[in-house]
């Protein structure tokens, strides 16, 4: 029996208008959270309590529209927003608002008869120019007070959480790792334990068991570290059987796990027969083998080499161990690694000696390896009075951690969307005959500030006009409604967040404007019988 599916097809402006409805609905849901007076969003969850959140990522992930054409727009803009959050830790809402403004302005330009090529080129050029201006306005983050300001804004002005974030970053260092967990009571706390972060994530989204965070979280996993490719389920069947029997998660870290081995792990995981995850091996080329040996020392195991059919004598107890593993799309965190401290220190010293004679490229690889061995893991436990409150605070703390680290690396600028709006408004006032594509970007760049002002009860056009008359660094303070020097007031945004939000929003909006045809599945299915 064959099931024949059908497509519904839309063309040209009709396709773009349908996509536009989805982008607008996503933006309308997300933008209410912007600024110090932003509102919470209440989200129903099947078989779980509802979520109350001010986190743009969580809101965006929850939106799935019945209109399939509109949902295409939701998916693409959500991807751009999530990419911003993954790379900078914040800026999801800003990226969404910018993408919608750019797309709607672009649609109007196309409807007015402007050519797609003209619009695209102008938008890309203006976006690059504006990003360079943002980078040029960067102010370095030098003191703990500067860090505290960034964290305080990102965590929505909860000073106790902001202080814990700064303490956590200081405890593990700029390149160290901090994870966020739930506290058992109302109080939040910080603990530093042995562990490491791997710049590789899960190889398949089917291993995700925390959809709200797109994460695979496993407690007390048995971790197989190998330099061999695993393609047959027979290579790991005894591990899988023991994992299911003991209800202990099974993890593979290696160069490649494919074929029926990967299929068996995915099938048994999705059917809840066992918990598992497959991670890509760190580094490339000759550095990969040594990096895998580092992992073995950290996790207290040995590297499995040679023919995988000869691994039958190994049990889960012989594999690597840690208290908790959290794997995301591009990174994995091992908390409470069970390796010997003395072995880690010895290995670290060997790497330090090798760095003395290494060229620049090799030295960077060695430095990464040494950092994995030396850096502890900070566990920031977030408390609250209810499960909903704890979940909402956790989301904000995770965003704030990334944003604070981003500020340390690229500096900060005046926040609340004020810098983008100020630069854009001055450009629009000074050049009234700029190409249409450039004008689209500069008009859209004012939209985040407009929304923040609106959420705070101010008149957006009045605020924009006032800012355009002030020198750089001045902007709108949504807390008291005044125009002031935002850098002095501590209202700041990391450069990376602002830059990536604009870059990713421009990229997705330009691609959406280029759509000439869109297709979605028709719900009608034909069933035909073969001879």
What are these regions (language model features)?
Residues 128-414, 518-531:
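Long, structured protein-protein interaction/assembly regions in large complexes
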Residues 19, 35, 89, 113, ...:
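Residue-level signature of catalytic and energy-coupling elements of molecular machines
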Residues 10, 84-94, 412-414:
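Glycine/serine-rich anion-binding loops at beta->alpha junctions
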Residues 11, 17-19, 64, 69-71, ...:
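Extended, low-charge hydrophobic alpha-helical regions
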Residues 49-85, 203-215, 220-221, 225-238:
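Glycine-rich oxoanion-binding loops at beta->alpha junctions
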Residues 46, 97-104, 128-131, 135, ...:
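Core structural elements
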Residues 109-151, 217-220, 226, 311-338, ...:
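A structural-propensity feature for long, helix-poor, extended segments
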Residues 1-47:
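N-terminal, positively charged regions that mediate nucleic acid binding
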